[in-house]
Amino acid sequence: MGRGRVEMKRIENKINRQVTFSKRRAGLLKKAHEISILCDAEVSLIVFSHKGKLFEYSSESCMEKVLERYERYSYAEKQLKAPDSHVNAQTNWSMEYSRLKAKIELWERNQRHYLGEDLESISIKELQNLEQQLDTSLKHIPSRKVCK
């Protein structure tokens, strides 16, 4: 016997809302992983909690690559839909602004990761890449000390 349908409205109780968010987020991440494996699809998922905490999943090794690919695709789509040069110029500026804003957010997120913050939201592969980058950076420090 299955459960009844849940009415789609905001859950007023803060604790119940948080529990539901955590469970549904886990289910969503699991489904994203399953579809990437079963269908050999490239899947990326970005979820922000109501407090702004980032949760992400990427079937690729790096979310940045997927975001860059998405930017290129959406840019090409917008170019095809905007033949007017004035509208096109305005679109280019707004797209450039959006692209740079996304890049800044990405750099800020990476900086937080380098400082050891928000690590629970990234995958094992990304943690391994982060560890490798930090090891490489640490190996360069003695050579810089010698140069000075």
UniProtKB/Swiss-Prot annotation:
GO terms for MF = DNA-binding transcription factor activity; protein dimerization activity; RNA polymerase II transcription regulatory region sequence-specific DNA binding
The residues covered by the MADS-box domain are 1-61
- Report if keyword Transcription is assigned: yes
Location in the cell reads: Nucleus
| InterPro entries found in the cross-reference section | MADS-box/MEF2_TF, MEF2-like_N, TF_Kbox, TF_MADSbox, TF_MADSbox_sf
> One GO BP annotation here?
flower development
GO CC annotation: what is one? nucleus
Family matches, as PROSITE patterns: K_BOX, MADS_BOX_1, MADS_BOX_2
**Per its UniProt record, what Pfam families does this chain match?**
K-box (PF01486), SRF-TF (PF00319)
Q: Which Gene3D superfamilies match?
A: Transcription factor, MADS-box
Describe the location of the K-box domain by residue ranges: 90-148
Give the record's keywords alphabetically.
Answer: Activator, Coiled coil, Developmental protein, Differentiation, DNA-binding, Flowering, Nucleus, Transcription, Transcription regulation
Family matches, as PANTHER family = SERUM RESPONSE FACTOR HOMOLOG
Give any extra note attached to this record. Answer: This is a truncated version of CAULIFLOWER that may contribute to the 'cauliflower'-shaped floral meristem (curd). This trait has likely been selected by early farmers during the domestication of modified inflorescence structures.
Function as written in the Swiss-Prot or TrEMBL entry: Probable transcription factor that promotes early floral meristem identity in synergy with APETALA1, FRUITFULL and LEAFY. Is required subsequently for the transition of an inflorescence meristem into a floral meristem. Seems to be partially redundant to the function of APETALA1.
Q: How does it assemble?
A: Homodimer capable of binding to CArG-box sequences.
The name of this protein is Truncated transcription factor CAULIFLOWER C
Encoding gene per record: CAL-C
